């Protein structure tokens, strides 16, 4: 009744001012959208940390006890968001953004201790592991050890009739329509020594029915083991997510707009991608020169044939987003601008220079996605990664969908003209997600000491009213917490005050990335006297604490 009376007063005031009724309706609709968005994005804060960066004794962070400890730290500090990078199986270079499948999970994240609890491994077997650095992921050695342990666990699993029945039931579910092709893809890739699918036999490249049938028979045991590994991954992930949700913490996942060429997705669906007769890309994805790279970024991903996607009603994309939203609560779409315009680089070019911008599917894609997911267009649980230059049309597309964009505080001080820099806190808007930096940025301390210009440092000092900046990471955290944006995310490295050696990724540098790990002491049982307590105080002070 109160809301109805308020609406009547609003209508009368507009009428008295002779504003057209359409203006009244627009105002009311905007208010409804704000209310609907608030239910998806309440005022909140959280931490960015990929599971590989967790502590643990097996060379790579995983979904075991330390992941639960991290959730406990988030809850104790009043946080309500855990943001992760893509969770798919990684290939060469271990980049989460170059997964072997957009539907499968990264089985390197399986908790081996969890398999001890299942009775498929022993503590004594895990105790015979090699030495692993606690500070950096040793992917080659860790994956070799994990592969051995997972195969050993599988050999025991097949004698556990109750578990076998549960696994088979999971595999038969209609949502696992992708699983058999993925398991075959992995078995063939292993058989061919890890070579890309375009280098397999011609009959396998072209997916001839007889060849695939023979391969399924020849590699039946390995295919079954890959099905088992996927079941274990999703069983462990679902349990971890349920625990996080029970603590009031939502998980933000990540969808790269493009998929890796050497992936089950492209092998199974070549008609959806811009490939030549032999399955190799005609053009590849990337971006022109920008802040991150003087020669641009040449990602190597094949481009979509958007006309074919449109012809199918964007069915593959709808399946992709639906599958992601079954394992996370909110999803960030990386390189959102690609739905408006995408950068097309001839495959033979060695760098991203010489490409051109081409129209993407625009709002038609999102209308189809909305219908396919059964959600209103302005209620999609999506964060638009809208970074880059010359984004006018992409920003308009984002705003028409009422999606939150992003602001990076490290980028806020590159100009003294505050009104020209949308990343400065006083230019933030409520429907936005603010970060000190992302996985592609240096840490705040690394930026402050190694990358920021004298002008940027002076601008930050003037902005906060200090002659000297002793803790640039906490200055930016304070800004993010105080922002009018509904969500603020801080990478764990910035909360811990770590330098450039803790950087997760440097775009354009293919080797040595994605390796940083936090230490056990960084995730204390009692947050008193730690950076977590300081984060908690700021969270409460700025109205972001949950519970």
Q: What name fits each language-model region?
A:
Residues 62-72, 314-323:
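Short, acidic/polar
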Residues 25-53, 57-65, 77:
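Mature N-terminal, pre-catalytic/accessory segment of carbohydrate-active enzymes
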